[in-house]
Amino acid sequence: MPAIALVAAGARLGLSLGKTFGARGFEVALIARSRERLDDLTGKLGAAGVTAAGFPADVADRPALAAALDSAAGRFGRIDVLHYSAPAAGSGETARGTGTLEVTVDNLQPQMESICYGAVTATRAVLPAMLAAGTGTLLYTTGASSVTPVPVFASAGMAGAALRRWILALNKALADKGIYAGHVAIGTWIAGTPGAPEGVSPKEPDDIARLYWDLHASRERAEHLISA
């Protein structure tokens, strides 16, 4: 069976992606920092009839992330689809990054590690096997500030923009090698995420997940922006 690796898998979009691809015959490798989260996600996917296994790793710990993906490939044979959900560093308001006039090398570096360098590390871990097989899919998620500047999210937006440019270059560089690379920028609230602003209509994670399947199956576009 084919396998998808969900890096930085979460309880909303990550779970929906696992169900969406699992319903179409994929086994699911889940990578996240928390063993408790991994156990919860694998249990929910198992209840939905999806074969899943968790591999703990922090995306900012490059050796651990690469090792987790190697373990996932060993467990499932190989990784056919990679999804990297670029997490901003920090928690709460700090996870959104630093405002434009407050950006420094020191506060930009953690965003680059988590959003950009983690994605490169994950890609390098699975790409050789994809190249050898002549097929594969690389999917990446960032916030909309990677496409449209948002001054209050400057540092996260800078890291996301760097990742976005590389993804678009990957799409071109891999097109004749049987491998598809696609980018999704999410500029809306996902249903179930705490703290949604008043008046915002969140999008259901299952609906968003189906978009990723369509990108994987059709390979027709390199990028999709989900707006409010």
Question: Could you describe each region identified by the protein language model?
Answer:
Residues L168, D176-A228:
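C-terminal helical subdomain
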